[in-house]
Amino acid sequence: MLADPNFHRSVVYLIDHSEDGALGVVLNRPSEIPVGDVVPTWASYVSEPRTVFVGGPVSPEAAICLGRCADAGDSPLWNALSDEIGVVDLNGDPLLAPGGITGLRVFAGYSGWSPGQLEAEMDMDGWFVLDAEPADLFVETAEELWRRVLARQRGPVRRFASFPEDPSVN
């Protein structure tokens, strides 16, 4: 596991991973900042809790928005990442967003890795690499997401779901 406090019990959704590096957002770090204070035009569309999430330590002044939509069509505000998940352009008018959005989350900053850095951390067992479920991105109780993701796994990794925060006081 990584010693970096930015990633302690973090669930990171990778948005991009290539030979140029990797970029993702932390899904389970809600802030107390209301989305309406940052991007007021999108506030009513955001999933509960309607706060900005801390996406990571890189560029905390930048906002990234992920959405869930079964059929985004050819909306100019949608950049598909998978069948249901995409990046939403917060500079656009929410009325031009694809219909059928069932989840929206705004992140301040992101998590970034230089070429080969994430792979090296994975080789040192610094990360569990697991499949995401679309609902993971939009849970209301994000603080429980780390345990929930691990608990649904098969095999030894599942045991970490009940691992104490500080094993030395166990």
Over which residues does each language-model region extend?
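A short aromatic-anchored loop/beta-hairpin motif
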Residues: 1-170
